[in-house]
Every structure is written in structure tokens, then in C-alpha cells.
UniProtKB/Swiss-Prot annotation:
It comes from the Eukaryota. This is ATP-dependent RNA helicase MSS116, mitochondrial. ATP-dependent RNA helicase required for mitochondrial splicing of group I and II introns. Also required for efficient mitochondrial translation. It comes from Lodderomyces elongisporus (strain ATCC 11503 / CBS 2605 / JCM 1781 / NBRC 1676 / NRRL YB-4239) (Yeast). Residues 1-37 form a transit peptide. It is an enzyme of class 3 (hydrolase). GO terms for biological process: mRNA processing; regulation of translation; RNA splicing. Keywords: ATP-binding, Helicase, Hydrolase, Mitochondrion, mRNA processing, mRNA splicing, Nucleotide-binding, RNA-binding, Transit peptide, Translation regulation. A motif (DEAD box) lies at residues 290-293. Its EC number is 3.6.4.13. InterPro entries: DEAD/DEAH_box_helicase_dom, Helicase_ATP-bd, Helicase_C-like, P-loop_NTPase. Residues 384-534 form the Helicase C-terminal domain.
Amino acid sequence: MMIARFGKQVLRKNVLVSNRIHFPVISRGFHNSFINKSDDLKSPPIDITKGQTEAKVETKKDKFAGFGLDLDELIGETAKGSQVTEQTELTKSEEEEKKKKNINTNTNKNDRKSVPAISLEDFNPSQFKDFKNTGLIDDVILRALDRAHFKDLTPIQQKSIVPLLETERGMVCRAKTGTGKTLTFLIPTLQSAVSRKIASGGRSSGVDTVIIVPTRDLALQIYDEYQKVLRGISGSRKPHISYVIGGMKNSFNPRNPSEIVIATPGRLEADLRSPLFASAFTDIKYRVYDEADRLLDVGFEPTLDSIDRSIKMIRSDDAEPLKSLLFSATVDARLDQFAKQHINKKYDYINTVPEDDPEVHENIHQVMYKCKDAIDKFGSFFNYVNQLVKDSPDMKMMVFLPTQTAVEFLYSYMSEACHKHDVDIDIFHLHGKRSASQRQRALSNFKRDDSGILITTDVAARGIDVKGVTHVVQLFPSSEIADYVHKVGRTGRAGKEGKAVLFITQPEMAYVRRLNSERGVTFEQVHESSEIDNSIDFFEGMRPDEQVANDFFYTLMSFLAQISSTYRLRADDLVAENVSLYRAILQKPDAKLSLRAASALIKRLNRDVVREFFEQGRGGNNGGYGGYGGYGGSSYGRSGGSNRYSGGGGNRSEKRFSFAGRGGNSGGHSGRGRGGRSGYSGGRSSQYSDWE
């Protein structure tokens, strides 16, 4: 049997060598059919039975530049990696020997819809205890998993853990959220960290794994998941974990580095410019991209490229080959290209999502309410909540809105309305302009409560795992079709049933048709809003903060411009019904928004619509719109506006009426508005801060 040597690693053709069990290599590279039959990707599948391994040998030493220090002694020079070309044929005797060991070496190159993860008759783990005495997972980790009450493997864990432990080229794993994905990469990275601790005699010897995620909230959730297992490990074998995320003080100490680091891209890129910080990453073994499709969607690819270059530059010559693991709910041509650049041109690929598996989990019951207009939509939603609170005391709901200002408005408005109409439910809110401590507190309180409502932006659409969410509600079309699936995925988790409810108006119906055509989304029940008991007038007697309302609708106009372009919706109709909602909220039938709010829409609007709903001026009825910037392609904010919700602190309760503003007992004005970031056309969301 021919052997190709990769540095210190040994790769037998078709068989990765472990100390006890031989496993087949997973499918090499990514098949075209997994990219929605895209013609952009023409690379044929690799026939691993032919035994061909191709690579170029290239080694280049790079210098660390820009620090003003000689870092050769500190971190060594860089080995960009070498590979050796070999061509070999498996003999018949070797094939027979493999069959005796019950190893499936068959890879059907024509079967591009399903790539088998592993096929071993004598090892099909269903519980973590099945790994005992295999030499794959250290007993100290298995005991810690048991103490943390992780006993049974989920389907993704059954398919993926062993290949992730054995891969030499790195791996792309397609997996849905809520399927046990975090534990899937936790185990191989923890195994590597424990081995490093043993080898170093319990001393800190640098970072072993870095996990890169799109949001602070997801980073903290993964951190908590690791801590559950680490609590069961003691003594010199126990690895340490820290985070490097925007908006919070680092828990990472480069002078005594933890073995595992969880990071958001912007903060990691910035900190790697520090020689001291970078020196802790010279012997990194694992790099994990979690929610990789979202990392690319929100515009982090240039940042990830920069991080990749930095890591390659600072790794020492004698470091083991870097293993990169990428997890994503969707895998398309763009992500495949990213994986080839960051992982390996012939990366291992495993698909844990069955070909005929619906985009939305079968445990999620999808319901649509067709509303007459935006006023009817918000009124019906409030009455829907009122009825649920009466009928289901343990109701736990997440409400998704498109902008941070929309979250602030609905949070304050619903809090007052619930108080006014004796609707007994706790309300929390979460978005990127709140401080990290406020966000963490809101999420923790929502998780802890048996019932409640969390109003949030897309920041919580991916990765955030809250047990017991019974309902997910969406009041606007998602900016991207894929986001719908991720939002509804917050319910129906861990085998429990959930309900996803979409409130939609006639001008937005093209969005529903796109959901069906692109994602196969069908609604089991479609109701008219009149079927809801609308006994409470949501708007009667309410006195909202006009500044908050102006901020909401100012940024909403830019969002409407974006979705009208994406889904080919009539901008005139969207503006008419939403400005009518604005008037109903303020109870001013002739109220108009500033013409500046329509700047992203102006070319699509009829002149009569512009005259009816907008006026020349500095900010609608009350000069609002400072503070958030919101959606759109321009900087909408101005200095002197309201920024009362972005800060840290205020002494009011997190539950009702908690404005969490900067300074004072009532969370008053901070005195400085913030301009908006560029809109979606620039690649990143205008709510970029939600993602770091």
C-alpha cells in the first residue's frame, strides 16, 4: 500500500489511519449537485477508488511585517505547507483485506446527491459511551460528557464526529441549526486541547483551536456549551476557553493563553495585529467556521481572508498542519470557493441533511395570517398575543423585526399596551445597539422565564438556542429568503413541536411565492386576520414616544426600498400602508414623514404618493431619525438626534418599560445621534453591529 506523507501526518490511500479503527476518507471536494445545480462550478467529483492524489509542492518563508519588531525568534517563519504527488492502485488483496474489516470503500461518483459519512458495521455509535476504548475520545472527555448529561448522539453527531476526528484535509459539514452541531465540533477540538495539555504537562502552550462566529451572542452561547463539558474535567488535563468578541472586554490573556478561543471576525482581525496576541497562535491546530454561510452573507469575507493570511504568517515551521472545519446550513458555489481557499482544494465534505429533507423542520407548524393592511397586521398581532396568553400560560414567543428601531418601538409600545389591557406577559428585547451586558441579560432572562416574548432583530435568527420557544412570529418579509428558514428554526427544537406565524399584507404576497418557489415553504394553515378575535383596539388611548416612532418609520422606509427591489414589490403600496400605520400610531391622520426618509425609494414612487406621505423638512413630525441610521445606502443619522437606546445602563426593569438608555434613572437622551451605515448594496447589513 502506497503512503503519502504530509509533514507529521500519515495518509493511506482511501484509509485514514487511527490507532484502533480504520475509517474511509469522506468524499473529496464538493459536488456540483449540492449547489442547486449551479453551472458556476465545473469541478468533477473525485473518484477516490482510482487512488489519485494531486498536489503541488511549494514552500515559502514569509516575514511578519508591520510590527516594528523582529519576530523570527518570537514566532518563527511560516511554512505555507507542502504536499507530495503520488499515484497508486489498490491491489485485489488489499480490497479483500478491507472487506474483512467491514470497511466500505465504495464511492459512487454518479451519486452526487448523497455522500455517505461513514459505514462501519462494527462501529455505529448511538451513545457517547460507545466511544470508550476506541482511542478516539479520551476517557476524561467521555466522563465529562456524561456528567453534563450528554448521553445520546444526535443524527448529525453520529455521522460527523468520527470523520471530524480523522480528517486531515479539513472538512465542510452541511448541517441545520438545532441538530446538535455545536457538540459535533466541540468534541474533536476538546480532544485536541486535552491531548495538548497532557503533552505539555498541564502547562499552557498556546492556542489550539479558534472558533469564528458571526455574532457575539452565538459566541457566548458556544462558550457556555463548552463550559458545561469543561466543568466535568479537573486537574492538569483541563483545557481553558476564552472569547475575543466585539463590544466586550477580552477574556483572553495572551501571556497565559487558553487552548480554545471563540471569536468574532472584526475583533480577531484587529487583535492579531498585536505581536503579543499573535504569538499565542503560532501552534494553532484547529480553525472552526460556524454559521459560515451567514459569515459570508453579512460581508465578513474580506475580514476572514485577512485573518487567514495572518494565521498562515504567524504559524511556526514545525506546527502540525492546520485543520479547518466549516459548518453551514447551506452550501452554494460561493461557500465552496471560500472553502477551497481557506480549507483545502480537495476538502472532505459531509452532508447531514437528507436530499428530500424539507427546509423547515417537520416539527414546525407554519401558519399565515393574511391582513388587510399594516394597521390590521399590527392590531391582529397584538390580539393574537392576547389570546395566546389567556389560552397558553407557558407560551414563549420570539418576534423578529427588520431594524433595531423597529425593535425599540414595538418593545416600548407593546409593553405599554400590555400594561393598559392587563395582558400579563414579560417582554424582552435584543438588538446590536444594546450593550453586550444588556443583550446577555435580556437573553438570560428570556431563557430563564417559563413564558415571555423576546422582540429581536435578525441577530438571534441563527445559532441562538433557547429551549421551549413555542412560537416564532414574523411581521415583515425577511431581507433574504434563507433568513425565513433560520428564524422559524428557533422553535421546534430538540424534538419538540413549535409554531411559526407569518403576518402578511397583500402588497407583500410576492415574498410568500418566493418562499415556496425557492425553499419549498408551504403553510399548513392560511387564515384571514378577521378570524382572530380583534376585540382590543391596539391603538386606542396610546400615547407613544413620537421620537421612537419617527426613528422606526424613518429606517423602515429604507428597509422597504430593499425588499421592494428584492421581491419586486410595489413601492407605492408598501409606503402607503406603512405611513398609514405611522399615522394610526401617532393618531394624527395627516402626519407625514420627512422626504429624506424616502431617499432610497424616491425613484420608485409615484409623485402623488410622495406628496401625500412625505414633506420637506428635517424629520417628519418631530424631527426624529437620529440614533440608528438603520437600513439604506446613505448615512441617515444626524448629530443631535436621539440615541437613547444604544447605551448601557438605566435603572428600569428589563421587563416592561425598560428603555435601557444611557445615563439617568429613566434612560434619557445621550445627546448624540449616529449616522447610518451603508445598506445592503455595500455587502454588509446596515445593522452591522448586530453581527459583532
